[in-house]
């Protein structure tokens, strides 16, 4: 199979084939996931919680993100690599640009930024530099303290209207992809139809252009013993991790995942 590129993802959106995305933090899992057909590997700052044991993503440094990106790059066999910019990267546009360059040098094909319309300037600057950006809207974990916890976003009409406007504005600024987290399924469908760029969902229903889960969640691994509503344990009924990942890819592609039970109402 040829390497997955941004052009590949754009083609999948146009054809209606769903995009399978999964978090990944090391070479072995990168090799396993890419061989199983995962289109996009997300080196997420979720590593702060599932690998480091923190209660949020805030303590993760950009240097740690670069380290794990390099690990994933060495094991990857053709998937597109997207890496989160750490929380510390957001205090100035100059810092965001410098840290994005560091992640691209480490092996990322795209960087991900959490936030709203205020990201238009750094996204535009990065696009001018040739750095593809995935904008992350809805429940943005780096803003967990502002939200008062990990809560569904966009249920109130004012919130929903702002999310729609943010999505369009960030596409116009140059965002190449969009991730929607924990928003009502109907709103996610509206946003997916309103923009031309690929839209990936997590807890956002089945109408987005693709799905992403945290690797540990979909393998049934948890420090707390509890999983978010939008998670399905794909290890159930499978004899190996590669088989579970392949089952996840199939379920995303044939739209059997997510089911209605994994989404949120307005």
Swiss-Prot record:
Main EC class of this protein?
transferase
Q: Which InterPro entries match?
A: Pantoate_hydroxy_MeTrfase, Pyrv/PenolPyrv_kinase-like_dom, Pyrv_kinase-like_dom_sf
**Record pathway:** Cofactor biosynthesis; (R)-pantothenate biosynthesis; (R)-pantoate from 3-methyl-2-oxobutanoate: step 1/2
Q: Which UniProt keywords apply?
A: Cytoplasm, Magnesium, Metal-binding, Pantothenate biosynthesis, Transferase
Catalyzed reactions: 3-methyl-2-oxobutanoate + (6R)-5,10-methylene-5,6,7,8-tetrahydrofolate + H2O = 2-dehydropantoate + (6S)-5,6,7,8-tetrahydrofolate
A Pfam family that the UniProt record links to this protein: Pantoate_transf
Record-listed E.C. numbers: 2.1.2.11
Instruction: Give the active-site positions.
Output: 181
GO-annotated molecular function: 3-methyl-2-oxobutanoate hydroxymethyltransferase activity; magnesium ion binding
**Binding-site positions, 3-methyl-2-oxobutanoate:** 45-46, 84, 112
Residues that bind Mg(2+), according to the entry?
45, 84, 114
Q: Could you say which cofactors this protein requires?
A: Mg(2+)
Spell out the GO cellular component terms annotated for this protein, sorted alphabetically and separated by semicolons: cytoplasm
Q: Which domain of life is it from?
A: Bacteria
Can you tell me where the transmembrane regions are? none
Major subcellular location class:
cytoplasm
Q: How is the cofactor bound?
A: Binds 1 Mg(2+) ion per subunit.
Q: Spell out the subcellular localization from the entry.
A: Cytoplasm
Q: Which biological process terms from the Gene Ontology are attached to this UniProt entry?
A: pantothenate biosynthetic process
Q: What does this protein do?
A: Catalyzes the reversible reaction in which hydroxymethyl group from 5,10-methylenetetrahydrofolate is transferred onto alpha-ketoisovalerate to form ketopantoate.
Q: Give the family per the record.
A: Belongs to the PanB family.
Q: How does it assemble?
A: Homodecamer; pentamer of dimers.
Tell me what this protein is called: 3-methyl-2-oxobutanoate hydroxymethyltransferase 2
Species assigned in the record: Pseudomonas aeruginosa (strain ATCC 15692 / DSM 22644 / CIP 104116 / JCM 14847 / LMG 12228 / 1C / PRS 101 / PAO1)
Gene name, per UniProt, is: panB2
């Amino acid at each position: 199979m040829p390497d997955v590129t941004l052009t590949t993802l754009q083609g999948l959106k146009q054809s209606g084939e769903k995009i399978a995305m999964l978090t990944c933090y090391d070479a072995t899992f990168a090799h396993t996931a890419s061989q199983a057909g995962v289109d996009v590997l997300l080196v997420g700052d979720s590593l702060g919680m599932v690998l480091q044991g923190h209660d949020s993503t805030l303590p993760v440094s950009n240097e740690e993100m670069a380290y794990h990106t390099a690990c994933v790059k060495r094991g990857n066999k053709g998937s597109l690599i997207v890496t989160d910019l750490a929380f510390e990267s957001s205090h100035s546009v100059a810092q965001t640009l410098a840290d994005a360059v560091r992640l691209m040098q480490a092996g990322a094909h795209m960087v991900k930024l959490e936030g709203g319309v205020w990201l238009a300037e750094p996204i535009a600057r990065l696009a001018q530099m040739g750095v593809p950006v995935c904008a992350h809207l809805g429940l943005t974990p780096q803003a967990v303290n502002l939200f008062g916890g990990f809560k569904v976003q966009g249920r109130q009409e004012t919130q929903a209207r702002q999310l729609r406007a943010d999505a369009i504005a960030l596409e116009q600024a140059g965002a190449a992809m969009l991730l929607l987290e924990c928003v009502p399924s109907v709103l996610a469908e509206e946003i997916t139809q309103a923009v031309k760029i690929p839209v990936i969902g997590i807890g956002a229903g089945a109408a987005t252009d693709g799905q992403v889960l945290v690797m540990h969640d979909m393998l049934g691994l948890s420090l707390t013993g509890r999983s978010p509503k939008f998670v399905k344990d794909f290890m159930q009924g499978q004899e190996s991790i590669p088989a579970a990942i392949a089952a996840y890819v199939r379920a995303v592609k044939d739209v059997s995942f997510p089911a209605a039970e994994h989404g949120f109402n307005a």
